[in-house]
Amino acid sequence: MLSASVERVGNTSVVHCAGQIVVGEGLSALRDTVLCELDKHTIFLDLSRVDRIDAGGLGLLVFLHTSVNGLGTALKLLSPSAQVTEVLKLTKLDSVFTLYPAADTDSELLHSAGEPYEASA
C-alpha cells in the first residue's frame, strides 16, 4: 500500500511517499497528488520510506517528470531508499532524475533546493 502526504512552503512542495510504488490504485492517487502541486516551482518526491518500486511505478515517475517539467515545474527525487536507488541505477533512470540527499529538516529543504548527489551503489 502507498501513502502520500504533502508539505508546502512558498513555491516548493514535498510529497512524502511511504510504502510501495507499484501497479494498482496507489499510482493514480500519487499521480493526482503530484499534479495538484503544479502551481509550485519545485516538487520534491520524498522516496526515503518507499520500500519497493516496480515497472508501473517507474513509468509513473517518468510520466510525472515529463508532464511536470513540460509545464515549467521541476520534479526532483528526495532521498530515494536503497531499493529505489538500485532500480533507478539498473534502468539508467538515475541520469534522468535529479536526486537529492535527505535534508536535516524538511524546512531546510523547502527553503533551499539543496545539492544534488550522485547515487552510489
Task: Show where each model-derived region lies.
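STAS-like cytosolic regulatory interaction modules
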Residues: 1-52, 63-121
